[in-house]
């Protein structure tokens, strides 16, 4: 007894290269953007190192604290006489440090928003401030007076006055409790060590005005950004040439950030793009486009919030949602009675094992209309049905099945222009696909064999055949050029 006819199973083809990588999926998971509008350019974004990772946004003459979970303003500090710069939250989340255009450096208590210190040792605008992550009572400031100062919070006194830059200092960062790196508009990166008499221990020339320097966690590498390029410097080798130069932006790069695992570098620029680099090979693995020139950027320590500030006052917040996986297993509590089904203090009735098992019979799937037509040897109707509503893979599967059962010529015969044109259009669309080309070439030859003498009888069919011919000629030309290229490569490698 023969087996009943089953459903037509789609053909399986070799998988094509997937243009969407796991890296793309991760960065595209930053969704649900929340856009806020400030009154002036957003010059600084800084995340707290403490959960829930609130962040400070510096814009105009105020610093606002945003909640990472609510993504709205929690506190506003507006006690500045002029434009504020570089709002920086201490690692314990209790204090805020910021400079302003008058040269004043202020420390605020975030719980009360009161001013704890107001320091005026700088004579020009202070564009960079940063608490030392290794000591709660130490912080730095960099100013347009070409100096970097290291302060003692408890006394409010300058511990070290680092001078050496020949132009504005616009960026500085801690490398350890005693070492820091700075960059300025003189195009130099300078490494300082406060333990020695002459604190400037090393300098490099970036070649353009530097907007940001970022030391890596290893302590042996510094990244600088100035103009449209990023340069990577090896401090151990001490060479004056960078180990790597990245030129993926069209305009000046204004901000850099690193993820918490120190495996990805993010850069933002005036071209409105954010680029993500894999630091193992320094290649761009993903990119994002924003509506305006980017001035500042921050990535939360848990890599769930990406915040970007722009020159037009737009603040964009993108969030990556993490689904919490809860264990379905009940924790087993040992002790007396646990072997008898008693968990904790709740008693349960012990049940014996069930020796009877019921196996449900798998339900057979119903045949689709084109399956029934194929089963009834109505080959032309089956082909028309999949051409009308089927996917390309299903149509190819039907054509291959018709070839196997010897029904292809029957399915293609006795067609008018209205039923033949959709098939020719399908051939034109997919004949260059390497997965389908072998089968579609056979179908094309069969159509020309059947209707070759009568092609001029219908304008619709003649136009469809002409377009199909153009596609075939294009593929032949590409193949010829590919063969020529192979020959050239063989000559070079011989």
Curated annotation (Swiss-Prot):
Described purpose of this protein according to its UniProt entry: Involved in nucleolar processing of pre-18S ribosomal RNA. Required for optimal pre-ribosomal RNA transcription by RNA polymerase I together with a subset of U3 proteins required for transcription (t-UTPs).
Alphabetical list of Pfam families matching this protein: UTP15_C (PF09384), WD40 (PF00400)
Repeat positions for WD: 37-76, 79-118, 121-161, 164-202, 205-243, 248-287, 289-328
SUPFAM superfamilies xref list: WD40 repeat-like
Keywords: Nucleus, Repeat, Ribonucleoprotein, Ribosome biogenesis, rRNA processing, Transcription, WD repeat
A GO molecular function held by the record: snoRNA binding
Cell location: Nucleus, Nucleolus
Lineage top rank: taxon: Eukaryota
Name this polypeptide is given: U3 small nucleolar RNA-associated protein 15
Principal location class: nucleus
Self-association and partners: Component of the ribosomal small subunit (SSU) processome.
Organism: Schizosaccharomyces pombe (strain 972 / ATCC 24843)
GO cellular component: cytosol; mitotic spindle; nucleolus; small-subunit processome; t-UTP complex
CDD domains: WD40
BP GO terms, sorted: maturation of SSU-rRNA; positive regulation of transcription by RNA polymerase I; rRNA processing
């Amino acid at each position: 007894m023969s087996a009943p006819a089953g459903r037509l199973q789609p053909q399986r083809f070799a998988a094509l290269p997937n243009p969407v990588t796991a890296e793309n999926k991760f960065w595209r998971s930053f969704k649900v953007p929340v856009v806020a509008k400030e009154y002036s350019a957003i010059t600084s974004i800084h995340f707290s190192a403490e959960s829930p990772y609130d962040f400070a946004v510096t814009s105009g003459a105020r610093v606002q604290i945003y909640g990472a979970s609510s993504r709205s303003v929690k506190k506003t500090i507006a006690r500045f006489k002029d434009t504020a710069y570089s709002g920086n939250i201490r690692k314990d989340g209790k204090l805020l440090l910021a400079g302003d255009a008058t040269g004043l450096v202020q420390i605020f208590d975030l719980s009360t928003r009161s001013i704890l210190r107001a320091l005026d040792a700088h004579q020009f605008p202070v564009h960079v401030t940063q608490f030392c992550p290794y000591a709660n009572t130490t912080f730095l400031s960099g100013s347009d007076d070409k100096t970097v100062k290291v302060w003692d919070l408890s006394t409010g006194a300058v511990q070290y006055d680092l001078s050496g830059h020949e132009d504005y200092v616009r960026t500085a960062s801690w490398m350890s409790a005693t070492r820091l790196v700075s960059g300025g508009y003189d195009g130099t990166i300078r490494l300082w060590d406060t333990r020695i008499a002459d604190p400037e221990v090393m300098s490099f020339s970036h070649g353009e005005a530097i907007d940001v320097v970022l030391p890596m966690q290893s302590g042996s590498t510094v990244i600088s950004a100035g103009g449209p390029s990023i340069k990577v410097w090896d401090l151990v080798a001490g060479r004056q040439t960078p180990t790597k130069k990245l030129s993926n932006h069209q305009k000046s790069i204004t901000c850099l950030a690193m993820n918490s695992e120190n495996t990805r570098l993010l850069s933002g620029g005036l071209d409105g793009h954010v680029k993500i680099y894999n630091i193992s090979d320094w290649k761009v693995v993903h990119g994002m486009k924003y509506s305006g020139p980017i001035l500042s950027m921050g990535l939360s320590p848990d890599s769930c919030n990406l915040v970007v500030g722009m020159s037009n006052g737009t603040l964009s917040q993108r969030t990556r949602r993490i689904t919490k996986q809860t264990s379905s297993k009940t924790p087993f509590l040992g002790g007396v009675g646990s072997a008898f089904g008693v968990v904790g203090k709740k008693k349960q009735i012990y049940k014996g094992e069930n020796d009877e098992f019921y196996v449900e019979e798998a339900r057979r799937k119903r045949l689709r209309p084109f399956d029934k037509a194929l089963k009834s040897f109505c080959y032309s109707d089956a082909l028309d049905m999949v051409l009308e509503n089927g996917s390309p893979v299903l149509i190819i599967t039907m054509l291959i099945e018709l070839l196997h059962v010897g029904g292809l010529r029957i399915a293609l015969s006795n067609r008018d222009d209205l039923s033949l044109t959709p098939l020719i259009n399908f051939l034109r669309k997919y004949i260059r696909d390497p997965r389908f080309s072998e089968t579609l070439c056979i179908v094309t030859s069969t159509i020309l064999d059947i209707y070759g003498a009568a092609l001029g009888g219908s304008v619709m069919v003649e136009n469809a055949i002409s377009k199909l011919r153009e596609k075939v000629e294009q593929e032949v030309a590409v193949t010829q050029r590919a063969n020529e290229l192979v020959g050239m490569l063989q000559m070079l490698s011989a």
